[in-house]
Amino acid sequence: KEELINIIKPDKPDPEAARVLQEILGGHYGEMRTMMQYFFQSSNFRGKETQYRDLLPGVFLEEITHVELVQNTINQLLNDSGESIAPGNTGVDGAPLDDAVRHANPHHFIVGAQASLPVDAAGNPWNGSWVYAHGNLIADLLDNLILESTGVLQKTRIYEMSSNQTF
């Protein structure tokens, strides 16, 4: 049975939180960049040091699980959103899309079939030019340190901004 590295505890639909969490998936310091950066550094590493030859692909594989976890969290936050007639979940005319357009990323509903997308919180597409693979192991590891540190900072900020237990 396939399981995520962390169990997601469903709370309540929250398309606003899903939109914000897109930054952690497809933003400049997001998991997609981190995954691809380790992938390219791993593939392009030509050094003879086997410990680094083993480390980089290992971290790349771990980052795949992070992308999957963030995608599943976004999807959980989008589940059942825009479908209820509860106050605050529809517009004045009762149309489910009203709430999605007003508070969420409309692309989650229109393009993404109410699921995660390879974009940041503003809806900008993920950008491969953010990936750094210099061919210099020390420079690559320093870039990774900044990337990982900034990613943790952003995740912490988003976690502290929401009371939704899905995070």
Which residues does each predicted region cover?
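Non-heme di-metal
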Residues: K1-F167
